[in-house]
């Protein structure tokens, strides 16, 4: 990988991991335009680690509070808002794990094409618009409850389909279930931690077993750039949606999907 490819792909990963705009849709464009080969598992792990570090550091106070409360709920039987939120995030992760292990190969075989990505980018963008329009804006993430958390987790499992956007579909589900915009985004971001960590661990296992060649310079640069982009993305996204809602991202998704359709089929 040359330096330009590392920079572009790392920034795309960092920005699109948490924006509701689909990383898959953005990653196919530079590959098609510049004729780049697959960046490899090692680079994927590096940029995922950068994104993971960004969300963990940004929400470090909330994560520490949840971890302490979660341990207290296990060993002392003490329940609190933080311990409940931790349990709900764990519960919301289960559907993605189940679907990931059972349907990953099928999705890779039948739903990985650029046409699917273009269409799902538009469809799930419209669904996000609908959710934002009907959102009741009532609850914080601490009022979610286990049933709503599980439903958001089921929605997260749909993100296995390329073009869906993990953050987009989970925020959509959370809005439909009554969470405030900022609360929906925060819950989605906290949900991403076990998912990104799990994906990175699985890819690391494949790297070890398949003896991949590692370009440490590309990995270090990719990880750092992904971290910076992801952290900035989280910060500004939470501020934007509090004032403007999801409309800018819906418009962008639809425009991108239409452009991809034209790029692919015309």
Swiss-Prot record:
GO terms for biological process: cell wall organization; peptidoglycan biosynthetic process; regulation of cell shape; response to antibiotic. It comes from the Bacteria. It is a multi-pass membrane protein. GO terms for molecular function: undecaprenyl-diphosphatase activity. It catalyses: di-trans,octa-cis-undecaprenyl diphosphate + H2O = di-trans,octa-cis-undecaprenyl phosphate + phosphate + H(+). The keyword Cell inner membrane applies. Its EC number is 3.6.1.27. Bacitracin is thought to be involved in the inhibition of peptidoglycan synthesis by sequestering undecaprenyl diphosphate, thereby reducing the pool of lipid carrier available. Belongs to the UppP family. This is Undecaprenyl-diphosphatase. It comes from Shewanella amazonensis (strain ATCC BAA-1098 / SB2B). The lineage of its organism: Bacteria, Pseudomonadati, Pseudomonadota, Gammaproteobacteria, Alteromonadales.
């Amino acid at each position: 990988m040359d330096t330009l490819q590392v920079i572009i792909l790392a920034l795309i990963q960092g920005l699109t991991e948490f924006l509701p705009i689909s990383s898959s849709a953005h990653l196919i464009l530079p590959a098609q335009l510049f004729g780049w080969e697959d960046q490899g598992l090692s680079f994927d792990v590096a940029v995922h680690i950068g994104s993971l570090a960004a969300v963990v550091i940004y929400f470090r106070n909330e994560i520490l509070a949840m971890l302490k409360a979660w341990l207290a709920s296990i060993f002392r039987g003490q329940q609190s808002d933080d311990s409940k939120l931790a349990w709900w995030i764990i519960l919301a992760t289960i559907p993605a794990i189940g679907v990931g292990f059972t349907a990953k190969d099928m999705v890779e075989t039948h739903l990985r094409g650029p046409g699917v990505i273009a269409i799902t980018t538009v469809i799930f963008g419209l669904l996000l618009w609908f959710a934002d329009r009907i959102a009741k804006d009532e609850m914080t993430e601490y009022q979610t409850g286990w049933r709503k958390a599980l439903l958001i987790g089921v929605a997260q499992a749909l993100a296995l389909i390329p073009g869906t956007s993990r953050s987009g579909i989970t925020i959509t589900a959370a809005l439909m279930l009554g969470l405030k915009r900022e609360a929906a985004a925060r819950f989605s971001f906290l949900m991403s931690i076990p998912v990104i960590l799990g994906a990175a661990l699985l890819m690391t296992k494949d790297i070890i077993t398949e003896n991949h060649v590692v370009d440490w310079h590309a990995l270090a640069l990719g990880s750092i750039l992904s971290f910076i982009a992801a952290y900035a993305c989280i910060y500004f996204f939470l501020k934007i949606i509090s004032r403007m809602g999801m409309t800018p991202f819906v418009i962008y998704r639809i425009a991108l999907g239409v452009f991809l359709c034209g790029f692919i089929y015309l």
